[in-house]
């Protein structure tokens, strides 16, 4: 091999391979280095082409020369005789004559050795005699405690694999390891309080964190530092009692981060506040305003902690949900602000609202549910038209005039009554209306007003079908729904395409309402119910026949320039979203319908608001606003009085 390459070529090759000359001839190592250098020196990898060529040529030359030198050392399998023959025995002896495996050494027999060396046994646990051997890993002592000291068990949680989060923990380990864990826990969790205690040769760490954690989080952090030492971590449920027990014999306090330790006030104040606050009172408030938003309820109730005598919202008397209940809940709100479980209290109150709504859905008829909704709207009118409100009845009556001009040759009063009858009767396969037409023709505006009038939710089905489950789950316990702006295929290239219509075609059981369907929300069990009726709004898309037959009525909207102009000039309607409010349609019904058309329990409210409308808006003023809509003018603009009409006419005789 020394004659395969010259001395200079050998040095150059080893230099290119990045290996010392002592490794020359170590072909496995040289080949590994060669493959690595080829990747580095390849021109495509940014290497030098000439250097790469030099490396490859030298290595190939060495490899070819070495193979040629070793050609005589091998043999062919064809030279081996048949196994078992006399020729094979002779060949086998010749083949092995250079391999002498016999050991010629002699050993002196010791007196301690047993006769027959084959009986000697070596223990697996015998320590190596060589001083350079790796020391064996220490094993955890079998005498390690399996549980917390008995004196402390009454103060600790016995839960196993619990996901509950807490702020107080007790760590039990060796005395030596407790010193390390004390410093590491202080760095990691920035505890409100931490102390280290001693029990014989064992250590305990009492830990209070500023935020809540699972027991597993503390255990996983500490176990990375305890490969040999035993470790037990448990949550503390009686914090002050546990701390006091750790400070008396047989325990010894070693160190704590707060000089003087803790007193009972540190633990008892939040507990006393949570005990004294009335959960029932908060639940009743949420039910009275029908608030199913956890964070809204939390914010509203915190506002009650302000003294009612200095509360600006109570002085203004604009928000009924505030000034009506402030004085009653002031004392309870003061205790509520000191609680650490505010979210849990509000969550229970919100759950009570959802439970009440579900009971109503299960027990009341749809006509009774609609009456409850109308009663809610009548009460809301009191708040909307309060003395300090920016809008008045005339503003909403302007919205009534705009709606009456929305669909030519259609009586809007009869239109709304037919829709109410449709959703109340809820007849299978005759439950959905479809609003279709060009862009900006009022489809969504009317659908939103009807949805607010009856109550319900708007749904988006323009998404992949496998993601619709939770979107449809929004309809749980709702009176009506609106499938808003459903997209599909259209001959109009200006309209975006979508899969909403295809998804609706696959939801026939939902639209028909003949059988119950499964609806689901996150973190809640599936609920089986009849899917609520409602409206589908869409632009000029192509509806398949299988979907058309599931609409009991299809209304085609047309673009009317005077509606667009009048709405643009009457900014008050868009600013306060008058046209999207169910209150506008309710006033339309009160204005045009007889009192007997409503349920008997609503008659006093209907009579009251008919009188209010007649007092605020005369019949002549109503006709004037309607004429402004048809002319594309500001609806609330008053024309010059000609002196012809001098008296206010009652609307009861009209229609």
Curated annotation (Swiss-Prot):
Report the record's Gene Ontology biological process terms: DNA replication; symbiont-mediated perturbation of host cell cycle G1/S transition checkpoint; symbiont-mediated suppression of host innate immune response; symbiont-mediated suppression of host JAK-STAT cascade via inhibition of JAK1 activity; symbiont-mediated suppression of host type I interferon-mediated signaling pathway
Major enzyme class: isomerase
Comment text on domains? The J domain is essential for multiple viral activities, including virion assembly, viral DNA replication, transformation and transcriptional activation.
Q: Which gene encodes it?
A: large T
Q: What protein name applies here? A: Large T antigen
- In the record, Phosphothreonine modifications are located at 134
Span of domain SF3 helicase: 411-570
Using the record, list the residue span of the signal peptide; answer none if the entry has no such feature. none
User: Where, by residue number, is the motif LXCXE motif?
Assistant: 101-105
Its PTM note reads: Phosphorylated on both serine and threonine residues. Small t antigen inhibits the dephosphorylation by the AC form of PP2A.
Region Disordered, annotated ranges = 110-145
Q: J domain location, by residue?
A: 12-84
Report which reactions are catalysed by this protein: Couples ATP hydrolysis with the unwinding of duplex DNA by translocating in the 3'-5' direction; ATP + H2O = ADP + phosphate + H(+)
Binding partners and assembly: Forms homohexamers in the presence of ATP. Interacts with host HDAC1. Interacts (via LXCXE domain) with host RB1; the interaction induces the aberrant dissociation of RB1-E2F1 complex thereby disrupting RB1's activity. Interacts (via LXCXE domain) with host pRB-related proteins RBL1 and RBL2. Interacts (via C-terminus) with host TOP1 and POLA1 allowing DNA replication. Interacts with host TP53, inhibiting TP53 binding to DNA. Interacts with host preinitiation complex components TBP, TFIIA and TFIID to regulate transcription initiation.
